[in-house]
Every structure is written in structure tokens, then in C-alpha cells.
């Protein structure tokens, strides 16, 4: 083992030089160690900030999950004071050119009386964007309510009200927020049965409307392309089945009596399956006020304090049907 040098750094000769060299090396090492520590600290802080930023971004994105895509088409049923419609447009969740709004009420004047402080401003905002707005639309009689006929086709009706901006787009999503018949039935069992009828008929009529609108588009496209389904992979065709069915979306409060409505069973009876569900996050829809069906008053408990969910239903397609459709597509491709 080397003998430890003793003496003063200022000493002359070899001994002093060695002591000075040793002190210099130690100083350099201390500086390097300090620099490495600072660098590690800085990197750690930067990493923590990055992680925190990513977590906040993920949280924000998770909170912004919508039951529909921005570039898809959407019809809102049973709108009250039109605040939900306005919110999704203002928040850029949907293109105004892809939106249709319907109300069960008879007219603008009726809604002004029902929602005197909120409706008119929302209505004017949406009207200025040339969004087609329909009144007297019963979700249990959709085709009849729209007065669709051979001479008065869906596309004539919708383009007349949208300044011809709808074109021949398919309908991909039908949304009914917090369905309620507005009857205020006290007998709970009867109340449940009537709402089950409402939901069942809504499912049934939505499927009829999808089929009526979208099948024509698909058939016209197939005739134009001589049987080749060139539209199958386009954004507006992705969520449609071969028969033209899109998504049916319900929002509903948690708990009773809503759980007893058994909407999944009602959907199944219409050949629908639950694709997914997600929490209805009120904060994602600023300006939206869930109202009573017959007045501007809030429900007994403020809606924003109540848990609710979105339910997205789609037409059930068996694996064999999917396989047959894929096989047909592959066969057509091979025959080229």
C-alpha cells in the first residue's frame, strides 16, 4: 500500500508537487461529481414534467371520449332547449354540416314558451349555421314524422333545410339523450312499461330509418361502380353494416327506475348489441342543461350531480355474415 503523503501543498520540491497534483485531481473529481448530480437532477425534473404532462394529456383525452367521431354524421332526437346540440358544435365535437336536430315539440313558439331563457339563443345560433332542424318528430314513428315518400325523399327533405350541404351523405349515428315520455306517471310499474315501449320503438324506428336512407346510397353506389363496393373503406361507410345500419346511441341516468328499463334486453330484441358504453361526463358539454320535458326547470336533483352513461348499440352481425362479406370482396378482387 502506498504511503500517505504528509506536508503542506505550498512545500517546495517533489513532495509539494505531488500534494498539489493530488489536491487538483480531487477538486476536478468533486466538480465532475457535482455536475453529474446537477445533470441527473435536471433530467429527473424534466422527466417528471414530461410524465406529468403526458398524464394530464391522457386524462384530458380520456375525459373527451365521445360516442361519435367528428367527421361522422349525426341526428339528435328529442332535443329540449337545444343546448346539447349547441355545445357539441361549439366544442368542435361534430361538424355542423354533419348534424341534424329534431324536436318532439310542435314549433319554435312552443319551445320559446317552454324554455323562455335558453331556447331562442341556442336555436338562432344553430339556425345561423344552416343546420337542419325538424319539429314534430316522434322517435317511435320516425319515417312517418319526416313525411318521407317516393316523391318526397329523405334527400329532398334534408337538403331543402340544409341549403343543399348535406348532399347524399349516409346517416351514421342517431342519438337520444335521456329519453322520457313526459307523462309523469306515478305508478312505477306502468311508468317502466311505457318507457320500455318508448325505447323499443325508438330502436325499431331508428333501424328502419337507417335502412331507408343508407341502403339507397349503397345501392346507387354499387350500380355506379358496377358491383364493386368502392365506398366500403371510406370514413362515412366504416360504421355501417352491409344493410346500411349505423350506431344508435342512448344516454341514461344510473339507478332506478332506469335500470329496470333493461335497455340492453330491448336492444337485443331488435337485433342490436351493445358495442360499448362510457360515463357521461357533464363537464365535457359546457352550456348543456338537462331539462324537464315540460319546462325549463331542472330535475329534482341537478343533473350534473347525477351519474349517467352513454350506450352505443349497433346491429348484430354474425361471424358467418362477416366472413361471407369478406369472401365476396376477396373473390371480386381475385377476378380482376
Swiss-Prot record:
Region called Disordered, residue ranges: 286-307
GO CC aspect terms: cytoplasm; nucleolus; nucleus
Compartment(s) where it occurs, according to its Swiss-Prot or TrEMBL record: Nucleus, Nucleolus
Catalytically driven reaction(s): uridine(2634) in 25S rRNA + S-adenosyl-L-methionine = N(3)-methyluridine(2634) in 25S rRNA + S-adenosyl-L-homocysteine + H(+)
Main enzyme class: transferase
Record carries keyword Transferase: yes
InterPro entries recorded: BMT5-like
Coiled coil: none
rRNA processing keyword on record: yes
Biological process per Gene Ontology, one example term: rRNA base methylation
Function noted in UniProt: S-adenosyl-L-methionine-dependent methyltransferase that specifically methylates the N(3) position of uridine 2634 (m3U2634) in 25S rRNA.
Extra information: Present with 2960 molecules/cell in log phase SD medium.
Family: Belongs to the class I-like SAM-binding methyltransferase superfamily. BMT5 family.
Protein's name in the database: 25S rRNA (uridine(2634)-N(3))-methyltransferase
Species: Saccharomyces cerevisiae (strain ATCC 204508 / S288c)
